[in-house]
């Protein structure tokens, strides 16, 4: 599994909590889907495109969510999980 940095863990929790306000089942499914994508990164760490920030890569984990990650010693480190509508990198 990729290494989840604290900011990415917080992002993931915030996303699922937001979804759970309206639909707890959908929140659980989103959390599961995000973790399923983690298995892909574990096997193929270079899967995502070159990131907008030097040294990062980006993977569309869901049409609404993008993972920002880096690869260190062939291990993917998930740095952030951003909604596709959010500005990244921050201005």
Where are each of the predicted segments found?
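Enriched for short, Lys/Arg-rich terminal
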Residues: 66, 70-91
